Design a protein with these regions (language model features):
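Hinge/lid segment of periplasmic solute-binding proteins
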Residues: 154-204, 223, 229, 256, ...
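C-terminal capping/gating helix-and-loop segments adjacent to ligand/active sites or protein-protein/ligand interfaces
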Residues: 407-418, 426-480
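Glycine-centered hinge/linker elements that transmit conformational signals in sensory
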Residues: 232, 275-306, 358
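Conserved N-terminal structural module of periplasmic/extracytoplasmic solute-binding proteins
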Residues: 27-28, 32-160, 347, 387, ...
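Short, solvent-exposed loop/beta-turn-alpha elements that line the ligand-binding surface or hinge
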Residues: 169-182, 247, 264-286, 341-348, ...
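Extracytoplasmic/periplasmic substrate-recognition and gating elements
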Residues: 117, 216, 341-407
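Extracytoplasmic/periplasmic solute-binding protein
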Residues: 81, 191, 195-197, 204, ...
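A structural signal for short loop-to-beta-strand junctions that line the ligand-binding cleft
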Residues: 141, 148-149, 177-212, 241-244, ...
């Protein structure tokens, strides 16, 4: 059974945050996001990292930790903390983020340096981690009650659990003057209370190698599912691996399963799933079958079941080194490809990159204007000083959003949309502008437990180790539908 709070949360995520994004895109001011997800449980707490790390920041799957929060009221007796006014006394902000590749790491350091220069009493201690390391570490720290002052979040069910446990602050009163300028705030708000702010949003689509497509006599990924399957065979016949995927990390593969759900269930069906937690529907089962149909064509690179997203022999490395023709990934893909080759910008790739939306599926309730994506933001920890909220507001201010957009395009602040000039990100921006609905990544949208089960069942489907019916039943059982 869904609690009243959970129901309101899901309605807000699917409708409010999503339609806010669409309104921004259609108005000509839009934003762009990368997605990642809740956390793993059993891992050591993070060591503060230096500001240069080697692995690209990615989007990844949630963890399977405790049972989903189902209490009618927050799990602790305490009300969420609220930010107080700045005292002007020396204060330290503990900031965790996952922008661990250049130039993003240096740009974030510059943002912190600028804020500290304007606020001499503030010291910002930055911990930079790779995505999966972050998710494991934040879960460990949360369990110990040692919450960073400001940390990466994707909103959704994982944040709702943190709210219920009293681990994050209600900052509604402090951010009301900026929240209206941002797309995706609904992902960080429950029952009219706001706990964080988005700094970028975006959607998933196909990144494809135009040169390899041309070698196979193709122009771009097909706009129908059946056409895409035909292209897979055409590419194989030309001696080209059609698709790169990091099924070992699970979350990259879940993009396929989830996007097929969106196409087959449609926006109404996805909202119904959110309301009743029941995945045992014909459209979900058909989505699983279509995953199996794709797998049967053997379209992926060798070793895909054990491959990760960001390793040299993983999904992004395979694409970067022209080992596959296309990749279903978020707008952060080009940056990851460039990073694999030691480049600062994807426009310098030694091959021509293109973007295309996910295809339409014949007979499905979904339409091409319904998309799949998510938000990245920062949440304020329960013991954070007021200056942490001020720093968060600084991060999402138009000028800083424009600065960040140099390497992380599609900012959440609609006033900074004019900073989007990268041709690859403009392609995603155009895709966003066509949307009437955007479904948040399922492994973020639901609780970490449910999201983790979506990813687990996806991995089994990609390994042809389960049936569509059993996959849907397993997710439903975890969700309590």
């Amino acid at each position: 059974m869904l609690t009243t709070k959970t129901t309101r949360f899901r309605r807000a995520i699917v409708l409010t945050a999503v339609l806010g994004l669409v309104a921004a895109a259609c108005g000509g001011d839009d934003d762009d996001s990368a997605a990642d997800e809740p956390a793993d449980t059993e891992a050591p707490a993070a060591e503060p990292a230096d500001t240069t790390a080697e692995e690209p920041a990615t989007a990844e799957e949630p963890a399977t930790a405790e049972e989903p929060a189902t209490a009618e009221e927050p799990a602790t007796a305490e009300e969420p903390a609220t930010a107080e006014e700045s005292s002007g006394e020396p204060v330290t902000i503990d900031w965790w983020h996952i922008q661990n590749t250049e130039p993003a790491t240096s740009n974030w350091q510059s943002v912190a340096d600028q804020f500290m220069a304007d606020h001499p009493n503030v010291t910002i201690d930055i911990t930079v981690m790779e995505n999966e390391a972050f998710k494991a570490a934040i879960q460990t720290n949360m369990q110990a009650g040692d919450v960073p002052d400001l940390f990466q979040s994707w909103g959704g069910g994982g944040l709702l659990q943190q709210v219920d446990a009293g681990l994050v602050q209600d900052i509604s009163g402090e951010v009301g003057d900026v929240a209206d300028d941002l797309t995706g705030v609904g992902s960080f708000s429950f029952d009219s209370a706001t706990y964080g702010l988005p700094w970028k949003v975006g959607m998933v689509g196909f990144w494809y190698n135009k040169d390899l497509f041309e070698q196979a006599g193709l122009e771009a990924p097909a706009d129908t599912w059946d056409g895409l399957l035909e292209q897979v065979q055409t590419l194989k016949d030309a001696g080209i691996t059609p698709i790169a995927v990091g099924a070992g990390d699970k979350w990259p593969a879940h993009f396929w399963y989830s996007y097929l759900m969106v196409r087959l269930c449609g926006s109404d069906g996805m909202v119904e799933i959110a309301m009743d937690n029941n995945f045992e529907r014909d459209c979900v089962i058909e989505a699983g079958q279509k995953v199996l149909d794709l797998v049967a064509l053997d379209p992926f690179q060798e070793g895909y079941l054990g491959a990760g997203w960001d390793a040299p022999d993983g999904e992004s490395g395979t694409m970067a080194n022209q080992g596959a023709a296309m990749d279903l990934m978020g707008q952060w893909g080009p940056g990851a490809f460039a990073s694999q080759l030691g480049l600062d910008n994807a426009v310098d790739l030694p091959w021509n990159l293109g973007w295309a939306p996910f295809p339409e599926v014949a007979g499905g309730a979904g339409v091409p204007t319904e998309g799949f994506g998510g938000v990245d933001g920062f949440v304020v920890g329960k013991d954070a000083p007021p200056e942490a909220v001020e720093f968060l507001k600084y991060i999402v201010s138009p000028d800083v959003q424009r600065e960040i957009s140099i390497d992380q395009p599609l900012p959440a602040n609609r006033e900074a949309a004019d900073a989007v000039t990268d041709p690859n990100q403009l392609a995603v921006f155009e895709g966003l502008s066509q949307l009437t609905f955007l479904q948040q990544y399922l492994d973020q949208f639901f609780t970490p437990e449910v999201g983790g089960m979506v990813n687990d069942q996806t991995a089994l489907l990609f390994g042809d180790a389960t049936t569509p019916e059993d996959a849907a039943a397993a997710i439903t059982a975890t969700a309590g539908g």
